[in-house]
From Swiss-Prot:
UniProt keyword Ligase present: yes
Gene Ontology cellular component list: cytosol
Organism: Synechococcus sp. (strain CC9902)
Protein name as it appears in the record: Leucine--tRNA ligase
Record-stated family: Belongs to the class-I aminoacyl-tRNA synthetase family.
Motif range ('KMSKS' region): 643-647
Principal subcellular localization: cytoplasm
GO BP terms: leucyl-tRNA aminoacylation
Annotated segments matching region Disordered: 1-37
Lineage of the species this protein comes from: Bacteria, Bacillati, Cyanobacteriota, Cyanophyceae, Synechococcales
Length: 884
């Protein structure tokens, strides 16, 4: 249920203006009616093909893109903010002379559609297409300048044909492979989850179920082959937020260290290799830990430890990766009975298995150095293992004795010949010693894991391979693509992949030997489809290949990408990997997909929550917002601003806002309320304020229309009045400021503030007191500056005042430096550092002149009371400070 909007009624339209204004200014209803006006102009833009991309243009190309949405069927305010920001940028770049590509598509595969289909007993394709139609209509009402001719939906076979084609490219390039692996299994959705899809509590990001661990044969992509490039090339992304680059760098997780080999006691053939970033602490190792799944565990475990090891491994199998590595959870393990030799000291160390060591991270084995690793000291204390300090520094011993590992630098002790070395130097010294002796190797590792793309569900892109008992894994011939999903099947939502139950679809002939074979029944992670969609937008109607190199050269990289911070790791990292992999396959020339990235903040609204029960209360049920109480219990309610959500009763339906105020008001509010990257707090009063601003502009243009017949300025008169000079100066200051706000760091809220200041200056000057050339220039500039933000009303203004063509096809206004020159300026007068007034002075006045004018001013007479100041501080062009 959506929340309410506009607690107070506005002085909105009553009678609709039924016809378009024309160049000859035919009489019209004098009231701003956004409903009729906006619908009329959108229809005209569509008829004129105003938003169609210029493919053969010699103009520079500019690709503006919003992260495409999942078609839930319901547009929310987060969508509105995302798409309106991108639309403003696209419209400005068109007016600046670029050929702009501004497309839209649908990230349409995935579990929500399949689950909805199960709940409603409807085909997910039918449900998805219906939602797409509904959301397209909702987006259209916002007045977005989208080229709908390039629309793509990832669930349509003419799109996922090419997702399959690209998968085969990766398979041929050795970047796609299968392996048995421990995977995160969602017992509710019955599918495998990537690590990134499991939250910090070990729950599925979608169903909320506690995730289990299972061994399955899965498809992976070798994103780790690109770990170094993905990390290093973050430095190229100067147009990305530092926060996103840091998040990706941390996720990739580069670590420098050494692999050290520990020989198994009593065996000349068996050894355990560990990776450590702290070879300087090797003398302090008191045990070695293996992952419970490590291949050596069975062979190393002694007979008396078999039962406890087996029981512990079963216990760990029920834990998710997130749970096992959580800092909050106690570390648990059992001994195997085996020992290894510390290669540096010769000491015998016991071998344990523990839940915090993962088989697929590093070597699946770690050395335990309790004195210098917090996780290790907790484990050692819990299991009575030795704690040996090997780095000395002020406060180190005391910290270790108190149970806190010393992880800072210091001086090596208890390390034999390395005693006395700085610990940072000891890292290299001990590694070099080990390399010479043959038990150590310098190594760089990454936290990044290969990308698991297998999903055991129906509504996804089929993986285009066939399993033949004779030939093995056989790619589907490219001429046979797409491998289409069977439609109209029964979806129980349980028991692994629904595709495996479709015998007519599964059973096929092997393309190599002709024998009986079976299709792959896993589908791809939906991020496969969204990791290359921006490339398809460059060449959407190509039936021979997913995109041509020429089209990609024309449009890519995306000049401005807009989307939520929640995609910092998943979508953005995968897209960067795809781009580099396809470059190496010779399909494209670019290294990075997105030149500039803007991560817009969330749209929040007020919530009322009972802190005792945790229950949210609908706004309509709160009788007194100033003293909010739970209507059932009488408890005092918490008042918060939180992300809009139906479950919190604080959602605002965009359609309701547009119905009441019009799309231009909705756009202006969403852009003005907060800087794009900050969270936005919904406020009905501020929506009303933007509507009133557009009404004031309406009245300004109405008044001017009786004076002007067109917007073709005949040039600026030489003999400007002070009032006219002020208007010209305000105009060109606004052009300069708004243009600056749309370059570099996009600041749309301050740009709108400049429009308000300019309109106030024109209005207060009185259009009837300005000569036509000045009024023409001022309104032409104002309307063109307004056009990207409020496109419908700006088009109406342009038409009413006799502008040629569409305002959206006009040039972006440029600054006339001569208009900014001032004969006189305002100089602040301070007395003892406090502002007491101001004077008007010649713009080129020197210090002596300004001092004289200040001393003889009424301000000085009032505050100095005839006394002579001891000191006068003059800052030319700004202020005079009188110090009595």
């Amino acid at each position: 249920m959506y929340g309410t909007i506009a607690a107070k009624p506005h002085a909105g339209p009553v009678n609709a203006a039924s016809s378009s204004a024309s160049a000859n200014n035919s009489p019209q209803e004098n009231r701003y009616d956004p409903s009729a006006l906006e619908q009329r102009w959108r229809a005209r833009w569509k008829d004129q093909g105003l938003d169609t991309t210029e493919t053969e243009s010699s103009k520079p190309g500019f690709f503006a893109l919003s992260m495409f949405p999942y078609p839930s069927g319901s547009l929310h305010m987060g969508h509105v903010r995302n798409y309106v920001i991108t639309d403003v940028i696209a419209r400005v770049q068109r007016m600046r002379g670029d050929s702009v590509l501004h497309p839209m598509g649908w990230d349409a595969f995935g579990l929500p559609a399949e689950n909805a289909a199960i709940e409603r007993n409807i085909d997910p394709g039918e449900w998805t297409d219906r939602n797409i139609d509904q959301m397209r209509n909702q987006l259209d009402r916002l007045g977005l300048s989208i080229d709908w001719d390039r629309e793509q939906a990832t669930c349509h076979s003419d799109y996922y044909r090419w997702t399959q084609w690209l998968f085969l490219e990766l398979l041929e390039g050795g970047l796609a492979y299968r392996k048995n692996a421990t995977v995160n299994w969602d017992p509710v959705d019955q599918t495998v989850l990537a690590n990134e899809q499991v939250d910090a509590d070990g729950r599925s990001w979608r169903s909320g179920a506690l995730v289990e661990q299972r061994q399955l044969n899965q498809w992976f992509l070798r994103i780790t082959d690109y770990a170094e490039a993905l990390l290093n090339d973050l430095d190229k992304l100067k147009g990305w937020p530092e926060r996103v680059r840091t998040m990706q760098a941390n996720w990739i997780g580069r670590s420098e260290g050494a692999e050290i080999t520990f020989q198994v006691t009593g065996s000349s053939q068996q050894s355990i290799t560990v990776f450590t970033t702290r070879p300087d602490t090797l003398s302090g190792a008191s045990y070695v830990v293996l992952a419970p799944e490590h291949q050596l565990v069975d062979g190393l475990t002694t007979e008396e430890h078999l039962a406890s090891v087996d029981q512990f491994r079963k216990q760990v199998a029920r834990l998710s990766t997130i749970e096992r590595t959580s800092d909050e959870r106690p570390k648990q393990g059992v001994a195997t009975g085996a020992c290894v030799t510390n290669p540096l000291t010769g000491e015998q160390l016991p071998v344990w298995i523990a839940d915090y060591v993962l088989a697929d991270y590093g070597t699946g084995a770690v050395m335990g150095v309790p004195a210098h690793d917090q996780r290790d000291i907790q484990f050692a204390k819990a299991n009575a293992l030795p704690i040996r300090q090997v780095i000395d520094a002020e406060g180190a011993k005391e910290a270790i004795d108190a149970g806190k590992a010393w992880t800072e630098a210091g001086t090596l002790i208890n390390s034999g010949v390395f005693d006395g070395q700085p610990s940072n130097q000891g890292k290299g010294s001990i590694t070099s010693h080990g390399e010479t002796a043959g038990w150590a190797t310098s190594k760089v590792t990454y936290r990044l894991r290969d990308w698991l793309i297998s999903r055991q569900r129906y509504w996804g892109c089929p993986i285009p391979v066939i399993h033949c008992p004779t030939c093995g894994v056989v790619p589907v011939p490219r001429d046979d693509l797409p491998v289409e999903l069977p439609r109209g099947i029964d979806l129980s939502g349980k028991g692994g992949s629904p595709l495996s139950q479709q015998s007519d679809w599964v059973n096929v002939s092997c393309p190599c030997c002709g024998g009986a074979a079976k299709r792959e029944t896993d589908t791809m992670d939906t991020f496969m489809c969204s990791s290359w969609y921006f490339l398809r937008f460059a060449d959407p109607h190509n039936t021979d290949q997913p995109f041509s190199k020429e089209a990609v050269r024309r449009w890519l990289p995306v000049k401005q990408y807009v989307g939520g911070i929640e995609h910092a790791i998943l979508h953005l990292l995968y897209s960067r990997f795809f781009t580099k992999a396809l470059r190496d396959r010779g399909l494209i020339d670019i290294d990075e997909p997105f030149e500039r990235l803007l991560t817009q903040g969330m749209v929040q609204a007020i919530t009322y929550r009972n802190p005792i029960t945790g229950k949210y209360i609908a706004t309509a049920d709160v009788s007194d917002p100033n003293d909010p109480l739970d209507p059932t219990t009488g408890d005092k309610l918490e008042v918060l601003f939180e992300k809009m959500s139906k479950s919190k009763y604080n959602g605002v339906d965009p359609a309701a806002v547009i119905d009441r105020y019009g799309a231009d008001t909705a756009r202006m509010f969403i852009l003005f309320k907060a800087p794009p990257e900050k969270d936005l707090e919904w406020d009905d009063a501020d929506v009303e304020g933007q509507f009133r601003f557009l009404q004031r502009l309406w009245r300004l243009v109405e008044n001017a229309s009786s004076t002007l017949t067109d917007l073709n300025s005949t040039g600026c008169p030489a003999d400007l009045t002070d009032q006219e000079a002020d208007v010209r100066r305000a105009l060109h200051l606004a052009i300069d400021a708004v243009s600056d706000d749309l370059n570099g760091e996009i600041q749309l809220n301050t740009a709108i503030s400049e429009l308000m200041k300019l309109s106030n200056t024109i209005t207060s000057s009185g259009p009837d007191r300005l000569r036509p050339p000045i009024l023409q220039e001022a309104l032409s500039g104002l309307i063109r500056l307004l056009a990207p933000f409020a496109p419908h009303i700006a088009e109406e203004f342009w038409s009413r005042l006799g502008g040629d063509g569409s305002v959206h096809q006009q040039s972006w206004p440029s600054v006339d430096p001569s208009a900014l020159i001032q004969d006189t300026i305002s100089i602040v007068i301070q007395v003892k550092g406090k502002v007491r007034g101001s004077i008007q002075a010649p713009a080129d006045a020197d210090k002596a002149t300004l001092e004289s004018m200040a001393l003889s001013s009424d301000v000085a007479n009032k505050w100095l009371e005839g006394a002579t100041p001891k000191r006068v501080i003059v800052v030319p062009g700004k202020l005079v400070n009188l110090v009595p």
